[in-house]
Amino acid sequence: ARIAKAAAYLEHYKEFEVCNVNYRITNSLAMELSGKLLNEEHYRERGRQLKKMALDCLTEDGLLIGEGKPVDGFSPKGCRPVDIGYNMEESLPSLVQYAYETDDEKLKETVKKALKYHLKFMLGDGAIDNSFGTRNYKWTYWGSRTSDGCMLGYLLAAEDEPVFGAAAKKNLNLL
């Protein structure tokens, strides 16, 4: 009953359409899982809608933008809101989980490209350089205080990309 109540609330919460991209992504996964668990296709459909909105925030290179205002636009100085750390520890792991949960091969490849792009910001010892991220104020050397970590996302995608498994291990060793 609690999951059904939470899913009903999340399904109609319109803030996901204008807030930071990580909420679109994590809620798309929540909607997919709720739809499967409760056998309610409309939750899964809402998950697909949110996933599509989130994918609009991926650049051609694989950089995830949208962690700030304006989510899908430019600041007065022409900048995009980016949070590398949160992308690596929250958004991309949730998106790769969604891809595997839905068995979406195209999405798996898209997310792997994004994961690979974001690895440019992982230091040799596994730390993530989030010095310019929109949430850099709550970043520690080993990661964020409010995200799940990059390990699950990189490990899920490591089957064809051994470098992902190595990155996850290095990051885990910092803890």
Language-model segment annotations:
Residues 5-175:
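Extracellular polysaccharide-recognition and catalytic grooves
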